[in-house]
Amino acid sequence: MKYKIFAGTCLVLIGLFAATSLYYKNEQARMYDFLAQNNASTFVRDHSPTLGSEDAKVFLVEFMDPACETCAAFSPLVKQMINANPGKIKLVLRYAPFHDGSDYFIKILEAAKRQGKYWETLNVMFKSQPYWASHHNPQPHKIWQFLPKAGLDLDQIKKDMNDPAIEKIIEQDIADAKTLN
């Protein structure tokens, strides 16, 4: 008799757990659907760099930090995924400057975008990251020796990266990241 009560209680608890998990999962999906439909600009801003087809139905929004080792490691994999699915995926990059000195590198990227060299500059940054992006001792000045590989006008980069509009882009991306939790 005790076994039947124990077994019955276990089945009820397992069923309750499964129902609660399913409910939670559905609520999360509804919440993200609501965010996507009612706050589309939270995912993609006019200033956001994009890669892939404009007609893509799948948007991959990545909040990244140019000083992040994981971001650098995943970048080639993301590009492979986009290339393996031509016309189907659009990558949207947003900024999440979590590491010391990241704002500096984002400003360089945004200045490079004005020269039409955003993706080349990001690739150079990711490849040279071990030389300048120590988490305990970042050395932003060291990036300048690698930037000529992106074909940039370095004097213009130094001027453009101080534009207050770039700071507003960083602030907007941080605010959107917080909104999305």
Enumerate the predicted regions with their spans:
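Extracytoplasmic thiol/disulfide redox context detector
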Residues: 1-101, 162, 166-181
